[in-house]
């Protein structure tokens, strides 16, 4: 037998193969032969682009099949001649396949002489099966009669490629499901082979012509199946559906759970030089309008925190209790409702997490999956997703190596994933109002055993965001325990009188109000500075403040902007993106976070900022409250907020736990004059220097409480 070399390699998948000695192979193709564990062999393809999976063998013997001469000539002529042993190979391919699974027997040839590297030269002889070829809508009747194949040419359809396959090719970048890259030279299947029943149709889906694909078509594109626009396809359409109703995008994001080592490192902030200033603040406790005296908990060792949690507290860097913690720990243990107001960075999160978790662990009142659902003992509501995620990690930190489970429930992540996590057992839920309300309504969260309800940044949810009715609805669910059987706690750095009135409706009559220092006082560890400017000069002032040359848009490599973390607050989402583009041009690593970004992007942005990979964060109101980020040295108010409470929360992102911080605000008399009287009083209370121009401008301001302007606050949908 002549064994002249050839470049042709053959891959076969069928029930039973001929012995290797009967198959003519070249030196090149012989390296592709593989054997399974039973000693049976199969051909592999030499090219690396093809899969090298071993062929599956049948338990039954294959029957020989007679090949018609027309089919043999068609294949041989397309390859461009004959080679030794070719007839034997073709005979081996066309055979009966009666394996256990009824899968068709196919062979794929890869030959440089043909137009398409993939075509089928075998068909299943099972009368029930249909010959299926990739990229075509062909049906073929194949019958077995006395060991021969009968195929009628009029039964072979050469219809155009399906849109589904074209979309799959585009999505995979031209890589077919077979694993090989399409080449420009292989633009279609041979008409000879296609007429004989072989090959894959490669007709353009767009113009219906043969020889190219829709992605390469020069003819005008077909119109969008959704809106009718010829300039794009349906999968790129941003319009509403045909019925005129805009359907919400399906959320598929599943957050990555950080490792505990990362959590301890990320949330650990060492006490600064001004930590003792917290203990100089005055403390007031009032219940039913009368002062209350209780014994404060001066250290964590004096509390009833379990030993396992106490080790985590020490590992987190807590050395002594702050004033808000000293009075909250005993009040929670006594079962009191609490309305607490303390300055930013004073440890309010630990003030409610530690006593609640301690009581639940000591009393062994925990939710397990064996209870048949999610029966949380504590629900913590927050105004933003980022704050919910932070409190969730704080809870993980304190409950590390304990049996307690704490889970986040907020919008922007996959609903099914969120439900599956809490259904495994969840003692404490931390979430935003919309998602928690949703899960309560559909029964995923059962409130029958809820003992604690905490509202963090309560003034924001009740007043600014208008979630008072939703909070009341959650409290008034029929299965939610009443006030006398449930503790309700509210915490914030600011509590306007109007919010206090609304909050009293959610608390017991004998609730205790804790005030550290003064309600609405700014953090004295933060140095507050101001720049008088107009709208057009803000950009230049910001760049100079960050050490960027405004003429060349360059930054020195040893500039502080690369080392110290800076948060820039703006009023509008578009301005955040614009400033980020400007800083990117100046080679300053900056990133944005606002309500228009998807939750996956927001989480990634915050993580990059925390790690220092992006030391400049340009943000709207979504991060102005509650976030505890290590190493924030500078806060810049590019746009002033619409009230003094938001200003206090913004500058409170720096100067945490007694560390010094710096805040710079750009003041435009055309836009910000109405907030100046409140700002002057805040500076005086914080023992800060008040600029003379600010005093002068504030003296001529009337009705300072009616200050409103367009600002990008957290929309109600954000809570979902």
UniProtKB/Swiss-Prot annotation:
Keyword terms, alphabetized: ATP-binding, Cytoplasm, Helicase, Hydrolase, Metal-binding, Nucleotide-binding, Repeat, RNA-binding, Zinc, Zinc-finger
Motif (DEAD box) on chain: 456-459
Pfam families listed in its UniProt record: DEAD (PF00270), Helicase_C (PF00271), zf-CCHC (PF00098)
Residues covered by the Helicase C-terminal domain: 549-698
EC main group: hydrolase
One MF term in the entry's GO annotations: JUN kinase binding
Entry keyword Ribonucleoprotein: no
GO cellular component, one term: nucleus
CDD domains: DEADc_DDX3_DDX4, SF2_C_DEAD
Compositionally biased residues, Polar residues: 1-11
Family statement: Belongs to the DEAD box helicase family. DDX4/VASA subfamily.
Name by which UniProt lists this protein: ATP-dependent RNA helicase glh-3
Species this protein is from: Caenorhabditis elegans
Record lineage: Eukaryota, Metazoa, Ecdysozoa, Nematoda, Chromadorea
Gene responsible for this protein: glh-3
